[in-house]
Amino acid sequence: MALKECTKKEQANSYELEVNVDGETFGNAVNRVYKKQVKSINIPGFRKGKAPRHVIEKMYGSEVFYEDAMQDCYPDALYEAAKEAGIKIVSVETLEAIEASKEGFSFKASVVVEPEMEINNYLGIEVTKKSTEVTDELVDEEIEKVRDRNSRMVTVDDRAAQNDDVAVIDFEGFVDGEAFEGGKAENYNLKLGSGNFIPGFEEQIVGHKTGEEFTITVKFPDDYQAEELKGKEAEFKINLHEIKAKELPEVDDEFVKDVSDKETLDEYKAELKETVAKRLQDEADKDVDNQISEKLMELLEGEIPEAMYDNQANEMVREFDMRLRSQGLDMKTYMQYMGMDANALKGMYKEEAEKRVKLRLALEAVARKENIEVTEADLDAEYGKMAEAYKMDVDKVKKAVPAESLTEDVKVEKALNLVKDKAVIK
C-alpha cells in the first residue's frame, strides 16, 4: 500500500488522500472474501459452498468479489496512508474507488484529521489549594454519619409526624372523583421530607398523629410521567397507621467499641481525624488537578473537529456498556428503564467528552513544544504497572497494548506532570 497524494482542503482539518493498494494485498483480500462468501453460493454441479473461486468468477464476472475486498482493505490502507502523511484521521467523510484489477486498486478518501493545536503560557499556572485543616466540627460530622448508619427506627406515639419521620400509611387517590391506576397502596412506608412523592403530599402528612384519617389535595406536575395526570388536581384519602422516628445511639466508649476497633472515644476521634485529613488532602489535590486542567483548556488555540467530540462520546458509551455487561445488565434494558434512546444516552457524555478531547489536545501541544520524549525505560515501567494492575504477564500486556498507543499516553502524562510541577499553588 502506498500514499499517492495528500491534499489539504479549504475546510479546517480536512484532507483528500489518494491511495494505491498493491496487487498482493488486494488479492489476499479477494481470497478472504471468497472464503467467507462461498459458503452461501450455489453453483450447478458443485455442492453448496464448494465451488472453486475461478468457477464463480467465470459465472459472475472476475470482479464479483472486488467491492467487498476493497471494503476489507480500506481500514489498513487509510491507517498506513495517514501514517505516511503524518496525520491522524478522526473521521472519513467519503470513500471513492478509482479503479480495480488483479494488479490492485486505487481510491480517494476525504478525511477529517486531528488538529495540531497551539498553546502558550502553560508554565507557571496559578491555582488555589483548598484548606486541609481538620477542625473539631469536621470530626463531629463524621461521628454523626456513623451514628446515623447505626440508628434504628422506633415507633412514636406521643407526638405528631414531622420531617425525617417514616409514616406508615394507606392512601388512595382520586381525580375528578375517580380512582386512577397506581394511586393506591396499603402500609406504605413514606419518609417525610424525602421529596419522593408529588409536591405537597408529604408536607400535608406532617402534623398529623397516629390513627388519624384525613384527606389531602395536591396537583400533579405539568411534566409528570403519566400523561393523563399531568397538571391535574387530585385528592388522596390517608390513613396514618404508625409514625416511626430514627433513634440515634449515645456517643460514648461503648458506642466506639461497637463501631470500631478502638476502646475509647478519644482514640476513635484521633483515628477519624487522620481519616478526614487524608480525605481533605485527596480532595484538595484533585481540585488542584481540575483547576490546572481547566486553565489548560482555556489556553488551547485552534479549531477542533466535531467528529473528535463525537468519537469520544461514542467511546464513553462503549465503556459504559462494558460496565453494564460486567454487572449482568445490557444497554437496551438500561435505556428502557431510564426512558431514553441512544441519542439521549450519548448526550449524557457530551460535556465530559468535550473536556477529555480538549485536555488531551492541550497536553499533546505541550508535549510538542517541550520536545517531550518517551524512552524504552518509560514504556517498560508503564507496561509493568499495567501487568501488576491487571494481574497479567507483561508479554501479554504488550501484545494487547501497542507500543505506539502507549507512547502517546505516556507522553501526555509527562506533559501533565510537567505543568503540575511548574504550577504556582497558593
Protein language model regions, located:
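Extended, domain-scale alpha-helical bundle/helix-rich regions
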Residues: 65, 71-117
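Acidic/polar surface patches and capping/hinge elements
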Residues: 127-151
